[in-house]
Amino acid sequence: ISNPNNTNLSNTEMNDNKSNPIISVDEKRFDSDNHSEDYQAYENLVKKTIDYESLEVTHHDDMRQVDEIVNLIVETVMCKNDKILIASDWYPASLVKKKFLMLTYSHIEYVLHCMSGNTTKVKNIKKYLLAALFNAPSTMNGYYQAEVNHDMPGLVR
């Protein structure tokens, strides 16, 4: 007679399923072989493009945030995914990387200015910064023109 309450064997011991480990996002996004060398190269390129040394002088009190922005740009540029999520929309990674590698001192200054003027609660700062950086080249001039129009209405054409 077999014992229906046989607790000597676990169901998992008789399971023939093969292991399927979950790969974290970071493991999928980055190739670890030359990661630190590539990261350093992109970090140097980004710092040169945004004129990091000038930001250190003009935005000394904001350098922690500037460093976070640099890290976010480099992380995004090194992303191995085909698409990148920006402000609830998926964009081709090539477009996002191109825009991020074209960011300049003025764009970073604009993002810092927008961040300092923001009074609403930001739930996901990474998503917020990604969107601000991605949109900076397309919105910066319009933003400053609107500021001038507001401050000096006599100059409006």
Label every model-predicted segment:
Residues 67-99:
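Short, amphipathic alpha-helical segments
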Residues 1-80:
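Charged low-complexity intrinsically disordered patches
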Residues 89-157:
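Short, cationic/aromatic linear interface patches
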